[in-house]
A protein has these predicted regions:
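Carbohydrate-active catalytic/glycan-binding domains of CAZyme proteins
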Residues: 1-297
Length: 297
C-alpha cells in the first residue's frame, strides 16, 4: 500500500540500518479520540512510499491500565532492547506515558512496568526518550494544557533500565513562550468560564552535527496545528531553551520527528491534515543550516 492509503497520526520512523528497512509507528486507531483503544500498528517499507502491513505492534491485555486515547507511540533502541513510549488514559486515571518493551522492533510490545512513568496526578502526554552525552536516559514529555492551561514541556532523568524516575521533573518551557503560538479556542472565548489556554504536543529531540541540541514540538499557530523548533542554549536537555520565532511547519500539520534515510538525507515526518480520518504521514527533506533545521529548497 502507498503512504496515502494509511490513516496515521503522530508518525514515527525507526530506520533499521541492518535490514535497510523503515518501520513506521503512530496513532493508528480509526477513532483515537473516544471509545476503547485497539492498539498500535506498524508498517514497513524500503523506500518510504510502498508499505507492508499493518503489523500489530501492541494489543492491550485485559489487565492493562490504559483503556482509551492510544496515542503517539515511539520506538527507541536502548541498551540492546527495543522500547515503545506511548500515551494512554482510563476512567479515573490521568493521561500518562507508559513504556513498553519487545525483543524486536515490530513487537509485540508489552508493558515494561505495571504503572506509567510520568508523575502521578499530572495530565501528561507524548513522552519521548532522550539520551544525553553522558549516556543517561531522560523522559521528555508534555504536562497537558487541559490541566494547567498553559501547556509545558518537562524533562525527567530515568534509571538505565527505564523502570523509574531517579530525579524530579525539570520544567523546560511553557507553550506561550513561543512567538508563533496562539491561544486556543477552548474554552470558548467570551464564555462564562473562558481563560487563555496554550497547547504543547509532541516533543522530539535532535542533535545537529555541530552539537546543537534542538527540540521539535507542536501547538496551535495562525493557520491551525503547527510545528515549531527550539534550541538549547547549553546544549543540554535542561536548557535554557530559546524558541525560534517561526514554525518549521505552519499550517495544518504537526507532531513530527527527524530521521536520516539510508542515502544520508535528513527527513522530517509529521501528520497532515490534522482532521480525522484524513490524517496521513508526510515526508519532507530538511537540512541543517546556521544552528537550526529548515526545509530543503
Amino acid at each position: 500500500m502507498k503512504t496515502s492509503d494509511i490513516q496515521i497520526r503522530d508518525p514515527y520512523i525507526y530506520a533499521d540500518q541492518q535490514e535497510k528497512m523503515y518501520y513506521m509507528f503512530g496513532t493508528t486507531d480509526k477513532n483515537c479520540w473516544r471509545g476503547p483503544g485497539q492498539g498500535f500498528d506498524c508498517y514497513k517499507s524500503k523506500d518510504l512510499q510502498e508499505w507492508e502491513g499493518p503489523i500489530p505492534a501492541f494489543r492491550p491485555s485485559d489487565q492493562f491500565w490504559g483503556k482509551e486515547n492510544f496515542w503517539a507511540p515511539e520506538v527507541h533502541h536502548f541498551n540492546g532492547q527495543f522500547y515503545m513510549f506511548a500515551t494512554f488514559i482510563a476512567e479515573q486515571r490521568y493521561r500518562a506515558t507508559q513504556i513498553l518493551t519487545a525483543p524486536n522492533v515490530f513487537g509485540p510490545y508489552v508493558p515494561l512496568t505495571d504503572e506509567p512513568i510520568t508523575p502521578d496526578n499530572w495530565q501528561c502526554l507524548d513522552g519521548t526518550l532522550h539520551v544525553d552525552e553522558s549516556g543517561d536516559p531522560w523522559l521528555v514529555f508534555c504536562h497537558e494544557w487541559v490541566q494547567i492551561h498553559n501547556g509545558s514541556v518537562y524533562a525527567m532523568r530515568l534509571s538505565h533500565d527505564l523502570k523509574r524516575a531517579v530525579e524530579r521533573p525539570y520544567f523546560l518551557f511553557h507553550a506561550s513562550e513561543a512567538p508563533w503560538v496562539k491561544q486556543t479556542g477552548w474554552p470558548e472565548p467570551g464564555g462564562k468560564y473562558h481563560f487563555p489556554t496554550y497547547v504543547t504536543d509532541g516533543p522530539f529531540l535532535h542533535r545537529l552535527t555541530d552539537g546543537t541540541l534542538l527540540m521539535l514540538w507542536s501547538s496551535i499557530g495562525n493557520k491551525g496545528y503547527a510545528m515549531g523548533v527550539c534550541r538549547s542554549e547549553s546544549g543540554h536537555i535542561l536548557g535554557p531553551w530559546q524558541q525560534l520565532p517561526d514554525p518549521i511547519w505552519a499550517e495544518d500539520g504537526g507532531h513530527g520527528m527527524i530521521f536520516q534515510t539510508f542515502a544520508g538525507q535528513l527527513m522530517l515526518t509529521f501528520h497532515s491534515p490534522n482532521r480525522t480520518p484524513d490524517e496521513r504521514a508526510v515526508f519532507v527533506a530538511i537540512e541543517e543550516k546556521n544552528g537550526r533545521v529548515q526545509l530543503q529548497a
